[in-house]
Amino acid sequence: MNSFVLMATVIREPELRFTKENQTPVCEFLVEFPGMRDDSPKESLKVVGWGNLANTIKETYHPGDRLIIEGRLGMNMIERQEGFKEKRAELTASRISLVDSGNGINPGELSSPPEPEAVDLSNTDDIPF
């Protein structure tokens, strides 16, 4: 089973396009994440979403947003202009969750549950157990 979960930051605005045959939406964007060690450079990865998720990606996520992305990791062979082939990793997303927004708004700040009402526990002698 190929299952991949990654926390990363969007570094390029998502680009929406449609397939030629049946006009299925496809959205691609680039994310960045820290290397394995503190002194390692940051790594980048192309993320692809299909169908309804593609539309959601385009409408919702922007550079600077930190996301948790779940999906499948694949390798693509790319023909370079220099005349050689290069393998590149690509994450096909199945689910995306916003960790925090690049505009400074945390998802928890957008809508928070109501505060619970205070309960008076000063007279606990009347409790039957």
UniProtKB/Swiss-Prot annotation:
Gene3D superfamilies: Nucleic acid-binding proteins (2.40.50.140). Residues 1-100 form the SSB domain. The keyword Membrane applies. This is Thylakoid-associated single-stranded DNA-binding protein slr1034. GO terms for biological process: DNA replication. It is found in: Cellular thylakoid membrane. It is a peripheral membrane protein. GO terms for cellular component: nucleoid; plasma membrane-derived thylakoid membrane. Pfam families: SSB. Its main location: membrane. It comes from the Bacteria. Homotetramer. The keyword Amino-acid biosynthesis does not apply. GO terms for molecular function: enzyme activator activity; single-stranded DNA binding. Keywords: DNA-binding, Membrane, Thylakoid. InterPro entries: NA-bd_OB-fold (IPR012340), Primosome_PriB/ssb (IPR000424). The lineage of its organism: Bacteria, Bacillati, Cyanobacteriota, Cyanophyceae, Synechococcales. Residues 99-129 are annotated as: Disordered.
